[in-house]
Amino acid sequence: MSRISDAFQKRKSLIAYITVGYPDIETTLRLVPLLEENGVDIIELGIPFSDPLADGVTIQNASYQALQNGVTPEVCLSVAALLKEKISIPMVFMGYYNPIYNYGLTKFCQKCATAGVSGFIIPDLPPGEAQDIDFAAREAGLDIIFLLAPTSTDERIKLVAAKSRGFIYLVSHSGVTGATANLPADLSSFVNRVRKTARQPLAVGFGISTPEQAQNIAKFSDGIIVGSRILQLVQTDPSLEKVATFIRQLRQSLD
């Protein structure tokens, strides 16, 4: 069992996404330990990219600002190495394939392992085209986590169930990331459809923005993923007190 899958064993897993270097590196280094202290089980560290196709306006803007701050994959690895000394929960990189490919797949995976990163998610890389990075990840002892959407075919579900390690990322709705008031009414049937095939923990993301939503989704999933709402609160309250309160509320709703 990996560190990532182990984070689902004792309770519903609360997974938090942040963009590395938004609004600056100093905030990232303060924010991640605060997330752990208030109940987060897994940290997703977003590698900023100039064309984040799967992301809504909040994460797009965060990525743009981080890129303006000079945040590269190398900087993200350095930040992870610093965070490794501050936290005990697993870290996962979330990033698009192009910057990782340009960095070098084997080199990236080896440096992830050295920096204390336990795995990664690449939203624009289909599992059927991931052989090279999957091999490099296995060699480095890393999990590679794939995504499924409500529109995924049974064939795709079987493929992801065979390939994904750590957990499977279930996208709550078609489209892009972003906090939303309403989630699909048939979300539970999608999760249950995947569960018939997959043995990995199932975590739901895209659009979760309230403790009530988190509590409802946790009834039929193994964990929830929150990102855009955290970044919005970071933007409005640099003290991070609102983020801490929000995470505590999410934790309470899951327990």
From Swiss-Prot:
Query: What molecular functions are annotated in GO for this chain?
Result: tryptophan synthase activity
> Known EC number(s)?
4.2.1.20
This protein's UniProt keywords: Amino-acid biosynthesis, Aromatic amino acid biosynthesis, Lyase, Tryptophan biosynthesis
Provide the catalytic activity annotation.
Answer: (1S,2R)-1-C-(indol-3-yl)glycerol 3-phosphate + L-serine = D-glyceraldehyde 3-phosphate + L-tryptophan + H2O
GO cellular component assignments: cytosol
Where in the sequence is the active site?
E44, D55
Q: Which InterPro entries match?
A: Aldolase_TIM, RibuloseP-bd_barrel, Trp_synthase_alpha_AS, Trp_synthase_suA
Quaternary state and interactors: Tetramer of two alpha and two beta chains.
**What's the family?**
Belongs to the TrpA family.
Under what name is this protein listed? Answer: Tryptophan synthase alpha chain
- Its source organism is Dehalococcoides mccartyi (strain ATCC BAA-2100 / JCM 16839 / KCTC 5957 / BAV1)
